[in-house]
């Protein structure tokens, strides 16, 4: 067991709750103590949902452990079915209740209820939230479609051409507490509609158990989020011969590849409009003169597997960034992320320790961090621009406006989210560079704060050398920065200043210098630049 201040994923029953809350006509009975009801806040506070999750907690207390907790479970199951009248029922237990081993799923199935019951066995001490969501979605669909799959195993499915209709697909994987899932679905619906493809079912987001019964009617499945839907897509492919897409349409090139793959799966002729990326401004900017400022920018990427892989491709192939670090907290996606890291000549960071990620960011010295809510905090402490690309996220990353990540418009949103922090960083550096110019007016307002130039100057000096711990030479004597050295260091762009300071101090120790002045800084620059 590990004690931590912050975690990237919750226990697997949170994933099950995400599936239940994303759907309609589905209820989740969770065997859990009163303290585990905190999960409601994730949906009402972060997702800003107008109603509570469809979850009934048994909320047992310490005094209940001396009696028959099984009867407590059955009572709550019966009350939930009578009150909410769901089309299907999920039954599971939280990490705490798992220790009691009441097996609430078996109890529910023995009650003779006249609705489908899906018993969830989610190992809380070896698996995490995304796995729990994936397993819940898989078990729910398998339980509902099992009889249909047995009946249709020998029946050949007619193609959409034979039936004389437009092809139709399922969009699988979007859920609540996913990163921009609501807007991604709208964008993909729009793109597919423009390409003559209809939507059969969107699940789990907005679907009901009766909608899931129509999944086999699709000609193909679109796997939007592999962490959630890949295992389900594999099962549908085995049992109903329904192919599914492997490319996630995040980025201009990925969207083009996605459409080409889907056209091929559906047996459609590839349209010339697929290669037409004029609907996104990202390719245009990448060809413009202004984009030269972005070329070669060092970027560190961390988050869930799907968004990390997409971000690495966009950064490397579409914006001309240099990826200097890549990693994920998703153990299920570790193999794919490692393969992508190898192609970039890197070693992937697979961890759920945010402090380890922060240390890796320090070592890589990037100019931009693409990560989760936690990397935003880490980057702020390190003075590095950051854009959030993945869950876990805070409420500010669930905008009320239309802000997808997928498709053509998603590429525009990504362009804005990634480039603006770098442009604001350039502005801050220019203000600092020309601060001592006689034409510079120090009192003007800027985006850096209501105190104008004075705030920025104070910020620059306070984040300079004085607050950093003294570095000791091998002989045990400290290395001091002179005022001249500090002045020269302040002229260096803030996004590489930390690396320059470390290299200069390393050079000073090797050269036996006790003080670092402007000349030492220039000597160090020449030494490491050679």
From Swiss-Prot:
<keyword id="KW-0149">Chlorophyll biosynthesis</keyword>
<comment type="similarity">
    <text>Belongs to the ChlB/BchB/BchZ family.</text>
</comment>
<keyword id="KW-0408">Iron</keyword>
<feature type="binding site">
    <location>
        <begin position="425"/>
        <end position="426"/>
    </location>
    <ligand>
        <name>substrate</name>
    </ligand>
</feature>
<dbReference type="InterPro" id="IPR042298">
    <property type="entry name" value="P-CP_red_C"/>
</dbReference>
<dbReference type="GO" id="GO:0019685">
    <property type="term" value="P:photosynthesis, dark reaction"/>
</dbReference>
<dbReference type="InterPro" id="IPR000510">
    <property type="entry name" value="Nase/OxRdtase_comp1"/>
</dbReference>
<feature type="compositionally biased region" description="Polar residues">
    <location>
        <begin position="458"/>
        <end position="473"/>
    </location>
</feature>
<dbReference type="GO" id="GO:0016636">
    <property type="term" value="F:oxidoreductase activity, acting on the CH-CH group of donors, iron-sulfur protein as acceptor"/>
</dbReference>
<feature type="active site" description="Proton donor">
    <location>
        <position position="290"/>
    </location>
</feature>
<dbReference type="InterPro" id="IPR013580">
    <property type="entry name" value="LI-POR_suB-like_C"/>
</dbReference>
<keyword id="KW-0602">Photosynthesis</keyword>
<feature type="region of interest" description="Disordered">
    <location>
        <begin position="448"/>
        <end position="483"/>
    </location>
</feature>
<dbReference type="InterPro" id="IPR016209">
    <property type="entry name" value="Protochlorophyllide_Rdtase"/>
</dbReference>
<dbReference type="InterPro" id="IPR005969">
    <property type="entry name" value="Protochl_reductB"/>
</dbReference>
<dbReference type="Pfam" id="PF08369">
    <property type="entry name" value="PCP_red"/>
</dbReference>
<dbReference type="GO" id="GO:0046872">
    <property type="term" value="F:metal ion binding"/>
</dbReference>
<keyword id="KW-0411">Iron-sulfur</keyword>
<dbReference type="GO" id="GO:0036068">
    <property type="term" value="P:light-independent chlorophyll biosynthetic process"/>
</dbReference>
<comment type="function">
    <text>Component of the dark-operative protochlorophyllide reductase (DPOR) that uses Mg-ATP and reduced ferredoxin to reduce ring D of protochlorophyllide (Pchlide) to form chlorophyllide a (Chlide). This reaction is light-independent. The NB-protein (ChlN-ChlB) is the catalytic component of the complex.</text>
</comment>
<protein>
    <recommendedName>
        <fullName>Light-independent protochlorophyllide reductase subunit B</fullName>
        <ecNumber>1.3.7.7</ecNumber>
    </recommendedName>
</protein>
<keyword id="KW-0067">ATP-binding</keyword>
<dbReference type="Pfam" id="PF00148">
    <property type="entry name" value="Oxidored_nitro"/>
</dbReference>
<keyword id="KW-0547">Nucleotide-binding</keyword>
<dbReference type="GO" id="GO:0005524">
    <property type="term" value="F:ATP binding"/>
</dbReference>
<dbReference type="GO" id="GO:0016730">
    <property type="term" value="F:oxidoreductase activity, acting on iron-sulfur proteins as donors"/>
</dbReference>
<dbReference type="InterPro" id="IPR050152">
    <property type="entry name" value="ChlB/BchB/BchZ"/>
</dbReference>
<keyword id="KW-0004">4Fe-4S</keyword>
<feature type="binding site">
    <location>
        <position position="36"/>
    </location>
    <ligand>
        <name>[4Fe-4S] cluster</name>
    </ligand>
</feature>
<keyword id="KW-0479">Metal-binding</keyword>
<dbReference type="GO" id="GO:0051539">
    <property type="term" value="F:4 iron, 4 sulfur cluster binding"/>
</dbReference>
<comment type="pathway">
    <text>Porphyrin-containing compound metabolism; chlorophyll biosynthesis (light-independent).</text>
</comment>
<comment type="subunit">
    <text>Protochlorophyllide reductase is composed of three subunits; ChlL, ChlN and ChlB. Forms a heterotetramer of two ChlB and two ChlN subunits.</text>
</comment>
<keyword id="KW-0560">Oxidoreductase</keyword>
């Amino acid at each position: 067991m590990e004690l931590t201040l912050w975690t990237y994923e919750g226990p697997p029953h949170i994933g099950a709750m995400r599936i239940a809350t994303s759907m309609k006509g589905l209820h989740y009975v969770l065997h859990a103590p009163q303290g585990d009801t905190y999960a409601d806040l994730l949906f009402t506070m972060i997702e800003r949902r107008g109603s509570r999750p469809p979850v009934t907690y048994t909320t047992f207390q310490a005094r209940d452990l001396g009696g028959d907790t099984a009867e407590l479970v059955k009572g709550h199951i019966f009350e939930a079915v009578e009150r909410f009248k769901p089309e299907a029922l999920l039954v599971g237990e939280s990490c705490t209740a798992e220790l009691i081993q009441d097996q609430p799923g078996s109890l529910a199935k023995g009650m003779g209820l006249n609705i489908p019951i899906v018993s969830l066995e989610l190992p809380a001490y070896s698996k995490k939230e995304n796995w729990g969501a994936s397993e819940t979605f898989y078990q729910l669909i398998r339980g509902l479609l099992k009889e249909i799959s047995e009946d249709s195993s020998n029946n050949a499915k007619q193609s959409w051409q034979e039936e004389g209709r437009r092809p139709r697909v399922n969009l699988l994987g979007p859920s609540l507490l996913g990163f921009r899932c609501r807007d991604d679905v709208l964008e993909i619906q729009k793109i597919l509609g423009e390409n003559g493809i209809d939507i059969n079912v969107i699940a789990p987001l907005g679907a009901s158990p009766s909608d899931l019964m129509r999944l086999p009617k699709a000609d193909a499945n679109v796997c939007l989020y592999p962490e959630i839907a890949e295992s389900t897509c594999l099962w549908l492919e085995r049992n109903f011969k329904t192919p599914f897409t492997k490319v996630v349409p995040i980025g201009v090139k990925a969207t083009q590849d996605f459409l080409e793959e889907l056209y091929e799966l559906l047996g459609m002729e590839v349209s010339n409009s697929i290669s037409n990326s004029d609907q996104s401004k990202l390719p245009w900017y990448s060809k413009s003169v202004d984009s030269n400022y972005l070329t070669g920018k060092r970027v560190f990427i961390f988050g869930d597997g799907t968004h990390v892989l997409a971000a690495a491709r966009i950064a490397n192939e579409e914006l001309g960034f240099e990826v200097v670090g890549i990693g994920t907290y998703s153990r299920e996606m570790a193999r794919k992320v490692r393969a992508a890291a190898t192609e970039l000549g890197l070693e992937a960071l697979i961890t759920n320790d945010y402090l380890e990620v922060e240390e890796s960011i320090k070592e890589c010295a990037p100019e931009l961090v693409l990560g989760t809510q936690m990397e935003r905090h880490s980057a702020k402490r390190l003075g590095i621009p950051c854009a959030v690309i993945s869950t876990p996220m805070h409420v500010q990353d669930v905008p009320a406006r239309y802000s997808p990540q997928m498709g053509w418009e998603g590429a525009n949103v990504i362009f804005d989210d990634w480039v603006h922090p770098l442009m604001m960083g350039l502005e801050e550096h220019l203000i600092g560079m020309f601060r001592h110019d006689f034409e510079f007016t120090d009192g003007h307002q800027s985006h850096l704060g209501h105190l104008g130039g004075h705030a920025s100057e104070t910020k620059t000096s306070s984040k300079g050398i004085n607050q950093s711990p003294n570095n000791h030479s091998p002989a045990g004597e400290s290395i001091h920065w002179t005022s001249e050295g500090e002045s020269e260091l302040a002229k260096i762009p803030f996004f590489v200043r930390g690396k320059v300071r470390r290299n200069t101090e390393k050079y000073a120790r090797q050269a036996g210098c006790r003080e670092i002045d402007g000349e030492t800084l220039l000597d160090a620059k020449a030494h490491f630049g050679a």
